[in-house]
């Protein structure tokens, strides 16, 4: 599928300084403090008094920064390596993305502990709503003018702000937990939905509205996810998504794990993405360390990542068709996923959560016979996809339930931070593997599937076509696998290559320290985004020169995708909501982290 794209996307330009010149011309060079990082984008500190004006300028400039890609905070109080930066107890960063420039810029603002407040930017980017709520939830930073500043990850009754450095990171640091009857009643009452708190009316002109909880254990919610629906009959007047039931504190865990030992935790973010979760993390760490991996490592990583793109999309396809009424295909897609997992397990030793990528390489070399397994799979799957297209995707029931349902355009997608198939289904040709190649994707031939209606059916079809392109990429990996090592020869490669430990005592000591304590990364900041199974996934890492991350920010695609739901589904039927939820393709671990 192809579509005419109204937005021309130029070649990627890392550290694009054009926007810095524009900002200096508009506000003066004295308005900003530039920070040198390894993020691949300009990072500028601005005074709080000018923050909103600067952000509004970037939103309205020629070739605008239409997407607020991310917004979060950092507790700076224990950070020791801050030379040249404005004094700050806390900081908040705004990561902006321009499709038309194909470049990013990060704006930071410093805050003192006794004055933790900022103006809301929900009037500039609507998706700032959830991000500002999360910053308040995690750090206690207030956003003046926010329409509903409340807990989003933690329960309403929670005390404290978990991502502060003085907040305990382990259960053993808390008092023993007990649930009294009074506390149980308090928790139950706090979960009761109050329409007035969200600006909703209980009655219309001639009718009473019904409020319905869809979830948090509804099968069509695809996880612990609750949506409170305001209904007039079966028509959705309004709705409020409620997340956080699956929150496990992944970003807090990263502060207590070594750079190496956090890798298995990345697998559990999008738990259907496998090594796709490892990739942005290890790439970001390798930027910090200055590691350039061998070409063979790049090709192996791409091959395994595309295998997991296929397994994730197969699960989406089967469960989505089941959501709209066809029960049989899900059994076939699960069987077909098993064939892919057979290959994955033979190469990595694990199925869903291999935790197989390493800082500087992969866990081990490809096993004997891997090529035959991969060859058999790439020859078999295209015919299988043809069968799915004919038997399921051309089915009149699926088309009737999804064509024209939950449609949105490119402008709306960018305003809400939508990426991946949900963005490309609107006709926007933005795939990081093409627009900003990483790990050697520029060496592969493949197409970016597009659609143009932006509805539930198009989102489904884009993912099916993506599986065909993944097969093309895997086939090229098979035919062009380089010779060479599976780890970089670098002091911070972890675990280090073991051969030298058998010859030199110094390398044996280094090996022991890096495996037991973890590598010491240079003090700096790095960032890496990738085209994951559900959209753009990224890691923003802050190192203070130690064996653990000072701050790890995990930006996932499913989080903004769920925030977009009310703007898309108002005025539709409840049955259309089910079709819409399935077409998003999300898992709650990817939302809640």
UniProtKB/Swiss-Prot annotation:
* Location within or outside the cell: Cell inner membrane
Which residue ranges does the record annotate as region NADH dehydrogenase I subunit C?
1-184
**Annotated catalysed reactions:** a quinone + NADH + 5 H(+)(in) = a quinol + NAD(+) + 4 H(+)(out)
Please give the family membership noted in the entry.
Answer: In the N-terminal section; belongs to the complex I 30 kDa subunit family.
Q: What is its main location?
A: membrane
**NADH dehydrogenase I subunit D as annotated region, ranges:** 208-593
GO cellular component annotations of the record = NADH dehydrogenase complex; plasma membrane
* Quaternary state and interactors: NDH-1 is composed of 13 different subunits. Subunits NuoB, CD, E, F, and G constitute the peripheral sector of the complex.
User: What does this protein do, in the record's words?
Assistant: NDH-1 shuttles electrons from NADH, via FMN and iron-sulfur (Fe-S) centers, to quinones in the respiratory chain. The immediate electron acceptor for the enzyme in this species is believed to be ubiquinone. Couples the redox reaction to proton translocation (for every two electrons transferred, four hydrogen ions are translocated across the cytoplasmic membrane), and thus conserves the redox energy in a proton gradient.
The record's annotation in NCBIfam families points to:
NuoC_fam, NuoD, PRK06075.1, PRK11742.1
Q: Which UniProt keywords apply?
A: Cell inner membrane, Cell membrane, Membrane, Multifunctional enzyme, NAD, Quinone, Translocase, Transport, Ubiquinone
Per its record, what are the GO molecular function terms?
Answer: NAD binding; NADH dehydrogenase (ubiquinone) activity; NADH:ubiquinone reductase (non-electrogenic) activity; quinone binding
The membrane topology noted for this protein in its Swiss-Prot or TrEMBL record is:
Peripheral membrane protein
The name of this protein is: NADH-quinone oxidoreductase subunit C/D
Q: What is its EC number?
A: 7.1.1.-
Q: Which Pfam families does its entry note?
A: Complex1_30kDa (PF00329), Complex1_49kDa (PF00346)
